[in-house]
Amino acid sequence: MSHNTFGHLFRVTTFGESHGVAIGCVVDGCPPMLPLTAEEIQRDLDRRRPGQSRFTTQRQEPDAVKILSGVMPHPGTGEQVTTGAPIGLLIENTDQRSKDYSDIKDKFRPGHADFTYEAKYGIRDYRGGGRSSARETAMRVAAGAIARKVVSGMRVRGALVQMGPHKIDRDKWDWDEIARNPFFCPDKDKAAFFESYLDGIRKSGSSIGAVIEVVADGVPAGLGAPIYAKLDGDLAAALMSINAVKGVEIGAGFGAAALTGEENADEMRSSSSDMGNHGPVFTSNHAGGILGGISTGQPIVARFAVKPTSSILSPRKTVDRNGAETDIFTRGRHDPCVGIRAVPVGEAMVACVLADHVLRHRGQVGAS
């Protein structure tokens, strides 16, 4: 199985399965002399960790990360810093229940990657989905914590802005509210609604989808490249690679199709400071901070749609490996809305793409 690596200069390779001994990643290309501790990575992992509320899977994984390589004490200060060597990270799996999946080892679960993995490789890991499980995304979050070190002047934040058909009130957006509720929701009133709404979904044994928005502030103008190395193209690919994601948009996205040219084009005004260093002032941001594949200096805004968790309690019709029709009953522990824990994953992927483009920009034009 190839294609377990993404990035060009800031490269992340993940490995491990949902019910294997451990999951891990190797981050290659991280610059040296950046302060980095396991505790800093752990803070990001704890935001994604399962079992923290009744609204996520009850699989109890501490997700305790170990740094295996790529760091050492600074020769002068003693502070742990990166060395420029590949950074190896490992998380041991501790709460697998593979027996929950024994009844479906020969059946294809609707909405899952069971059939497609079998069709491609002739074998699949039915125990929690193997590589196709969202368990893999823990290592993306760990890599994202390192990426944030590379782009320390930028701030990457995500929020759940829609659950099912219910959208937040953008006039009530409060970034501080995200840490106060289990949904990463910036709208206090809608977070209270989501609690009762998702309780009903959860108790019925069903699931629901969500839309996540990630905003990156402090991104300088000039990151990215034309045609085949567009910043928005890489962001879209990175976000689409997340489990259960079925759509990505940048800025106005699909909404731009309903706008006129006058409405969509972000007008510019002269800034009071040196244009060469700071650029113009934009009167809107329908472009989502990217034009021609290159950042404008405005906040980068990306949204992605997460489908409902395919593992639900109601019986479904399917076929087995022999092509015979059969019923399937899903057991195990699953998220009623996998979009909740996708928020820190989306942040991590955006941070990794930005780190990669910072290093590529530095290599091409010599700028820091």
From Swiss-Prot:
Cofactors, names only: FMNH2
Q: In which pathway does it act?
A: Metabolic intermediate biosynthesis; chorismate biosynthesis; chorismate from D-erythrose 4-phosphate and phosphoenolpyruvate: step 7/7
Name the Pfam families on file: Chorismate_synt
Any one GO CC term of the record: cytosol
Top class in the EC scheme: lyase
Q: Which residues bind NADP(+)?
A: 48, 54
Which CDD domains does the UniProt record give? Chorismate_synthase
Enumerate the catalysed reactions.
Answer: 5-O-(1-carboxyvinyl)-3-phosphoshikimate = chorismate + phosphate
Q: List UniProt keywords, sorted A-Z.
A: Amino-acid biosynthesis, Aromatic amino acid biosynthesis, FAD, Flavoprotein, FMN, Lyase, NADP
Tell me which InterPro entries the record gives.
Answer: Chorismate_synth, Chorismate_synth_AroC_sf, Chorismate_synthase_CS
One GO-annotated biological process of the protein: aromatic amino acid family biosynthetic process
Q: What is its EC number?
A: 4.2.3.5
Annotated binding of FMN, by residue: 131-133, 243-244, 292, 307-311, 333
Top-level taxonomic group: Bacteria
The GO molecular function terms of this record are: chorismate synthase activity; FMN binding
The cofactor binding remark recorded in the entry reads: Reduced FMN (FMNH(2)).
Q: What is stated as this protein's family in its record?
A: Belongs to the chorismate synthase family.
Tell me the function of this protein.
This reaction introduces a second double bond into the aromatic ring system.
Q: How does it assemble?
A: Homotetramer.
Which NCBIfam families does the UniProt record give?
A: aroC, PRK05382.1
Protein name listed in UniProt: Chorismate synthase
The species this protein belongs to is Nitrobacter winogradskyi (strain ATCC 25391 / DSM 10237 / CIP 104748 / NCIMB 11846 / Nb-255)
